[in-house]
């Protein structure tokens, strides 16, 4: 039984507005995307601009120039091993392949720089240059670099080369992974989109409070109240 009709129907009307707005948010009315997709893309564009650290990573990689390593790497399968040979040879390494296993001798610094140059092109959304360089898909190139670095890191730890392991791990996470994830995302500055960012934060708080008050008024209309 409704004890207070004014509060109950007022809360019900607020809930109806909440639901209507939610339907709009989940509808493809923002350039063919729903509201969540639109905001997710916006935040990705903004975060890409602030996450770019490849020049700093190149400086760290240069410190390993002249550091010659002999590595034994096991790749996922024969196909990935064959594709990875191209990457390593482009970096000046000597590679012997046997199935999915690679025996690599090369300058550690040159290998790191070669991977970072490809990552830099991907970060700038110039994947065509990467694919034409190796004659296969640019995303697969970066994935193969990432897989190579994972295998190299494993072998470096076996050899107790922990400084090199730390360096390649950082470059893999901050260089390769980000260039792969942000590929084809157009970077934007916070200063250029501060209006929509401020609106989204204010809207989120207001929308949440609106929902809370609608529930509260409906329960009060039913005669239910919180008491100390």
Spell out what each predicted region is.
Residues 27-55, 188-193:
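Alpha-helical transmembrane signal-anchor/signal-peptide segments
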Residues 157, 161, 169-206:
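Short, aromatic-rich amphipathic segments at membrane interfaces
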